[in-house]
């Protein structure tokens, strides 16, 4: 009676060994060529641009299996989640990224956008200030910080305008026009 079980078990083991691995990151233009770990980020970038999100995530995961400390792939994962329309996952990924790679300013800049979108301008300011401390010449972070200051000014002007200040109302109108860009 044990023999049929062993035969079945042996057959299953053999069958699973014959099934190819579930995924292999391959060259997008030449699928017969497997990508090396340092080629995967470029392929992921292209896949995200082409909106092939499932394949991009598979490439990221495979790349992280080969190189678990790849800052580029971990960052791309947050970019992928944002592109896919999963901002909560993107934000979690960025928070995790900052804990692992606190020296990379782009993560602070991207995370600040989420804080700003929630209206948490103080947190956005903290994150952007950190990005600028890491790289003082980071123009995008500086511009985003200026936008945070403008949004805070708009909030203050709204309160003043509701209180009856005509000059605050005029400034608010001008500022809102400026913020449309």
For every predicted segment, state its role.
Residues 50-58, 83-96, 118-130, 149-159:
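Structural signature of tandem alpha-helical TPR/SEL1-like repeats
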Residues 38-69, 79, 83:
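Alpha-helical segment of the N-proximal tetratricopeptide repeat
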Residues 64-65, 95-99, 129-133, 162:
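Conserved structural position within tetratricopeptide repeats
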Residues 25-37, 147-181:
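Terminal, low-structured helical/coil segments at or just beyond the last alpha-helical repeat
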Residues 36-37, 71-72, 105-106, 139-140, ...:
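Helix-start (N-cap) detector for alpha-helical repeat units in TPR-like alpha-solenoids
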